[in-house]
Amino acid sequence: MMRKKPELLSPAGDMEKLKMAVAYGADAVYLAGTSFGMRSFAGTFSPEELPCAVAYAHDHGVRVHVTVNTMPRSGEVDALPAHLERLNDAGVDALILADLGAFTLAGKYAPRCERHISTQQSIANYACAQAWYDLGAKRVVLARELSMDEIREIRRRTSPELELETFCHGAMCVSYSGRCLLSNYMTGRDSNRGACAQPCRYQYALMEEKRPGEYFPVFEDEKGTYIMNSRDMCMIDHLDDLMDAGVDCLKIEGRAKSAYYAAIVTGAYRHVIDDVAQGRPADPVWRDEVEHVSHRHYSTGFFYGPPGQYYESSRYIRDWQICAVVTGCTPEGLATLSLRNKFRTGDTVEVVGPDTRPFSLTVPEMTDADGLPLFEPKTPQMTFTMSLPRSVPPMSFIRHAVDLSGK
């Protein structure tokens, strides 16, 4: 069964992450300028950097969406027109907006940019989605709280020209589509103006009211004790349902995460989307790839009802570590590498890259920049060479299981 292929939208917290997402198969990337983005600590693009980022993406056939999704105060609104004009002039394809005033100003000062409505607007029904379309929105990012049946209903009862976007992978906020005041209250950092401190991820202790100052740590057992820590969403096994529900764009969360995360998760979803759209069984090797990045235990979120939200632990699973990044490779497989973490001759490592299925090898003797034998590269970012069984593309990764890193 052939299906319409949705856009794959990947995070790009900086230029390295953007290039990785592009190389590994993103149809579009989303990023932020230095103002009015919801993840001010996730990496941003300056006014000088943004045109270069847009040009790079467009040269590779990839669209650029920019977040303008904070809830600005009156004292901040005067800076919006100039910011929007810069985005418009840079060639940005779409703006992700949450505030109605910012949405209106975007129509005036960034007329070349599509207007997409952020998940911060908590769009949970067809009437709200249609209302935004009637106001001029090209796309709405649906609330994470929706079930698959609710998405189908929204698709059925809205204009077919309105595009529906939903998150398919990554962290989930325990608040209603990000409308949380914990950060404001506990740290003074406004979660709805791009400065969330993520207090829902903290580990808490208990204090009994008649024993002030005595703190009892919250221990974890087989039933779980962490509070407010949701699992990460992973819908890679259910992309057929999302496509059949009428979703036009699948979004990967993670602008604050690593370039390796952006690459591996994008690559995994790229291959599975292509398989499902062509009616082929999904190759399990790509499903396994999402287990090779740092993540919390996975769930299907609310797509199939509340049970997908049950959780036992807030701890990250970090089973794999990057050793090096391939910066170049000859047709014979002689790879030039940039070191990220120590490894040595004789270790078993994996190689994975753009359109490259992961394969294992035993590390041979390496060579430093002066052509001298190298048993264990140790200096971060150092350049060295290593022979591989076959040629691989630039931006491929050498990685190993974490238990090897103690050698």
Give the residues covered by each predicted segment.
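Surface-exposed amphipathic alpha-helical tracts and adjacent flexible/coil segments at the periphery
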Residues: 1-23, 28-31, 35, 60-70, ...
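Active-site beta->alpha loop and helix N-cap motifs at the rims of alpha/beta catalytic domains
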Residues: 14-17, 35-126
